[in-house]
C-alpha cells in the first residue's frame, strides 16, 4: 500500500443542482495520487439513491446530462445512501492518507465542499482546509497564456470518476505547459 501524508485526494460529486440547501449529491468518486500526480488508487464510485420527487425536480440541464450519461438510471437503481457512501469513502481514504493532511483536489472544489459540509460532514472534516483547485490554473491560463488554455481540450462526461481523471490530466498539462515544470 502507498500510505503517505503527502498523497493527494481527488474528489468529484455530481449533484441534482447547485444549491446545497435544495439539491442533493447523486454521485461521489475519489482517486488518490502521490504528489507527482501518479494515480495510486481509484476509490469506489457510488451512485447515491435519492427520492423520485427530488430527481423530477431537477432543472433541464441536470436532467438532460444525468440522463444522457446513464447516471440518473444508476441513481434510481442504487441502494446506497449518502451516509453509506460517506462511510465507505472514508474507509478507502484512510488507507492512503491521515485525516487533515490532504487538500481537497479537483475542479471547482468549493462547490463540492459546500455539499460535503451539508451532507457528508465527516468526509468534509477528513480533508485539510486548503484546496487544490485546477480551475485556478485554467482561469490564469485563459488570462495570461490564452494559447496554452486553448490547446487543452477537456470534455466533461459529468460522471464523477472520469471527471477526476480529467482533472488530474488537466493539472499535468498545466504543470508542463503553464508552469513549465517536468515531473
Swiss-Prot record:
Example of a GO cellular component annotation carried by this entry? cytoplasm
Enzyme Commission number(s):
3.1.15.-
GO terms classed as biological process = DNA metabolic process
Its gene name is: orn
The family line of this record is: Belongs to the oligoribonuclease family.
Give the top-level enzyme category: hydrolase
Protein's job: 3'-to-5' exoribonuclease specific for small oligoribonucleotides.
Keyword NADP present in the record's keywords: the answer is no
Q: Which organism is it from?
A: Coxiella burnetii (strain RSA 493 / Nine Mile phase I)
All copies of the Exonuclease domain together span 8-171
Q: Which UniProt keywords apply?
A: Cytoplasm, Exonuclease, Hydrolase, Nuclease
UniProt cross-references to SUPFAM superfamilies, sorted A to Z: Ribonuclease H-like
Q: What is a single Pfam family found in this protein's UniProt entry? A: RNase_T
Which Gene Ontology molecular function entries are recorded, alphabetically? 3'-5'-RNA exonuclease activity; nucleic acid binding
UniProt lineage = Bacteria, Pseudomonadati, Pseudomonadota, Gammaproteobacteria, Legionellales
Active site: which residues?
129
**Keyword field contains Cytoplasm:** yes
Protein's recorded name: Oligoribonuclease
Subcellular location, in the record's words? Cytoplasm
